[in-house]
Each structure stands twice: as C-alpha cells, then as structure tokens.
Amino acid sequence: MAPDVRTKRVYDPAEPGDGYRVLIDRLWPRGVSRERARLDEWARDLAPSDDLRKWFNHDPKRYPEFRERYREELRAHTDRIDELRVRASHGPVTIVYGARDTEHNDAVVLAELVRAS
C-alpha cells in the first residue's frame, strides 16, 4: 500500500481524517495552543536547521535550492523518515507546518521523501 501522506497548515482545523499529525517546525507556531493543534508528535528533529530556515526566509525564488539543502539535512534522519513511511502505509499521516505558502515549504519536501520508496 502506498503511504498516505498529507500536508496541512497548523492554523487549519484538525480533522479525524488527518490521522497521525506531526508538526515539523522547529519553533512553536504563534497563536496556536497545543490543544488546538491536536498533534500526535512534534518532530523538531525533522525541521530545517535554523541557518537554512533563516536563509530561505519563505522566498519562493529560493525554494529549489532550499529543497535540495533540506533534503541533504534529512539524510541524517532516514530512520525517522522510514518510521513515518511505515506509519503512513497503515493510515493517514499529516505533516503539519506553520508557513503561509502551501507549495514552497518544508512539509512539502518531507512529504515527497516519505512517499518515495
């Protein structure tokens, strides 16, 4: 079964269909309580490094390079990515993030890796 991996902003309401919800931001999102976030896990270890996050600064023009650099950082966490892949093969996994841009963010990159076999 192909992994069922989704991405969702932490500011959007949690839904039962989200399955296992994992936040991958290094910093807690502003204005969101832990209760409202309804997370199963806060995986700070899977977030981009502070240096990479600051360099990217959510600039879509930098996204291609950000994507490559973040993928390089994630190579140190293949075991964690494998854990998410296994979990997603048994039910939905929603990678939760705080960025406004729904197409150019760390969750999109991580979801690609989790979906890859």
Give, region by region, the residue ranges found by the protein language model:
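Residues lining hydrophobic/aromatic ligand-binding pockets adjacent to catalytic sites
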Residues: 1-117
